[in-house]
Amino acid sequence: MSAEFFSSKREEGSLASGPSFRSNQRKILNLLLERDASFSISSDLPTTPVEKKLFGDSANLSILSGGTPKRCLDLSNLSSGEMSATQLTASADLDETGHLESTGPEQVRLAGMNYRQHLIKCSPAQLFCSTPNALEHGRRKKDAICGSSANKENDNGNLVENEMKHLGSPITTVSKLHKNPELAEDQAEEISDELMEFSLEDQEKAKPPLNWSSLYRSSSLPDSLNSPSLKQVVKFKDSTIPDKLKKKYCSNQKELGKGLGLKKMVSLCDINMTQMLEEDSNQGPLIGDFSKVCALPTVSGKHQDLKYVNPETVAALLSGEFQGLIEKFYIIDCRYPYEYLGGHIQGALNLHSQEELYNFFLKKPIVPWDNQKRIVIVFHCEFSSERGPRMCRSLREEDRTLNQYPALYYPELYILKGGYRDFFPEYMELCEPQSYCPMHHQDHKAELLRCRNQSKAWEGERQLQEQIALLVKDVSP
């Protein structure tokens, strides 16, 4: 209805009486309410989205006034889902004479504007409806107002969304889930699945790779800093072996490993094997076949692979102090013949060439009559630095070739430390004749040259024979 209706009714009310006018007007109002369901007041001002939210799309209002409402409108026809919660209570206040307080359309517009501003500033108005649905919706609205602190962000979002749509803003918001519960559940499941996939991908990306640190290692860092060793000791609960037994078992295994290693090294290096066995025996150095301890006391010398004895030991040997252990001994003088004739130890044999040495000892090996006694050979030259040690090694090598390792014909070979030069001044009485002829004597230069050439020829022949023997072994199947 328009504002002209109110102006015409006001003119008729002035002619009629007060009570009759009031009853007639109420009937007309009820008829109009049943027909149109509400009074529509048109204002020149455009409605905002906030007003649409509060008043609804139709902006249904009763006659507005500044006083309290005196009649609750029956808005049962308007309770249709969404609009049932936006019904407002208002009635036209009449004065005692039956006249309306608002006398014109302008006052109605002003009253509507003031009431709209009042509703925007204040909390939502309480609704009085005649239908149970409206009452229930009003109760729900009241509960929602009580929890407005929790739902404030959602309400503000809805208001902003409606206002954007009214103003034609290009900014859009995220669409809500469908009102259909089945579709809403499907959408919720899809969203939850996507969120789970994103969370799993983030976790996988967040996990650092295990081996990338070694691939992208800085070359300036040392290996100990860049790739720390992570050692973890795993202890099993079911293990019933005590720690003491474990340590004992490990030590036994280590000792067994050492023993096996020693047996394996015998065929590789005689010197290392001899030194190890000597350290283990704690009784002294062993003889060449590793069966017994040396009968003569040894001292350190120039060559570590050979055993040295001092002049005192040789003198004791000559005097017969080792008869209980030694059945026979030989002192080999490796000097040249003119040196030997110039003075030598009592009972010494002059063998200055390898051929003579082999013929004497290896052509017919000397075997002791008593197996408990030994045969001892002592080599020496002027200083026991070259010729004596060379002859001793030569005899040992040839003896090895004739026997199966570690057996030897002559397992005990010694070197007189210091040679004849050191022995003669101390034990001149044990020398025959009691004199000393050096190798570089002026009277024996020609003889020295002849002996050297002869020794070189013998050495060349020996090397040639060894090469021939190696070739024969390689050719033979």
UniProtKB/Swiss-Prot annotation:
Modification Phosphoserine occurs at: 20, 38, 58, 62, 65, 123, 130, 169, 192, 199, 218, 220, 476
Post-translational modification: Phosphorylated by CHEK1 and MAPK14 at Ser-220. This phosphorylation creates a binding site for 14-3-3 protein and inhibits the phosphatase. Phosphorylated by PLK4. Phosphorylated by PLK1, leading to activate the phosphatase activity. Phosphorylation by PLK3 at Ser-192 promotes nuclear translocation. Ser-199 is a minor phosphorylation site. Phosphorylation by CDK1 occurs at G2 and G2-M transition and leads to increased activity.
Subunit structure: Interacts with MAPK14 and 14-3-3 proteins. When phosphorylated on Ser-130 and/or Thr-131, interacts with PLK1. Interacts with MARK3/C-TAK1.
Enzyme class: hydrolase
Species, as recorded: Bos taurus (Bovine)
UniProt-listed PANTHER family: M-PHASE INDUCER PHOSPHATASE 3, M-PHASE INDUCER PHOSPHATASE DUAL SPECIFICITY PHOSPHATASE CDC25
Active site positions, chain numbering: 381
Protein name in the entry: M-phase inducer phosphatase 3
Main location: nucleus
Family designation: Belongs to the MPI phosphatase family.
PROSITE patterns on file: RHODANESE_3
